[in-house]
UniProtKB/Swiss-Prot annotation:
Its main location: cytoplasm. Residues 294-304 have a biased composition (Acidic residues). The keyword Cytoplasm applies. Gene3D superfamilies: 3.30.420.100. GO terms for biological process: ribosomal large subunit assembly; translation. Belongs to the universal ribosomal protein uL18 family. GO terms for cellular component: cytosolic large ribosomal subunit; nucleus. It comes from Oryza sativa subsp. indica (Rice). This is Large ribosomal subunit protein uL18. The keyword RNA-binding applies.
Amino acid sequence: MGGFVKTQKTNAYYKRFQVKFKRRRQGKTDYRARIRLTNQDKNKYNTPKYRFVVRFTNKDITAQIVYATIAGDIVMAAAYSHELPRYGLEVGLTNYAAAYCTGLLLARRVLKLRGLDQEYEGNIEATGEDYYVEPADERRPFRALLDVGLIRTTTGNRVFGALKGALDGGLDIPHSDKRFAGFKKDEKQLDSDIHRKYIYGGHVADYMRSMAEEEPEKFQAHFSEYLKKGIDADGMEALYKKVHAAIRADPTMAKSTKKEPATHKRYNLKKLTYEQRKASLVERLNALNSSAGADDDDEEEDDE
């Protein structure tokens, strides 16, 4: 029987070995997808492909409009779910409904930046149905491509909540309704009522009701932040409607108010002039001489 034979890598193997890109080695970037999202036709000059980038962390949602340059990616506009408390949504900043609000905020912000917010108001009342922006007579809608990164694009994923928010906000993003929450695979169509329920946080409200009945103690702990803010299951839809209206009223980014840094005391020694250094040296020499004279007097007293 032949045993395990270790593959011998020759000197030529190491000499010709080429490492992959750093972000591929770290598992952060899908370069196969990126090259298709950034490469532009060579007969189009200074016309970048804009990407609608959505990323999730444990406590935040980031949505950005990005375009690629040789020097690196440039972020044209960004919106974060931690901005939503300013619009009245203080809890549940990472769910499907919050993702919708973040996408809507980014869409209104970038259109205002480009002066298109009056021409393209988008879908003002979120019904859950699919929406495509219609081109106006003068200027075309702002077009971007969805960049999900390494997120698994399952049906009902939060990234498609952000996509729906951006579409209703007035952006032109190529898409299909097959991945929105509420799409029924058997019937091959989107159930707009289910999708509307997710947009307005109805799935969270249902969970609140069921947990309050079945496990009251767990409900008090799980939804403690909701209870502190006085948010209940029945008022969820009205809350999100107010948030959507507030976003449309003022999508601009608020400047953060930071305290001025405290002035620290400096402990650097002051640089002395030549005269000061000379005077200091004389003082030290006099002190040494006086101490040496005192020692001599003590020795004479001891001898006596």
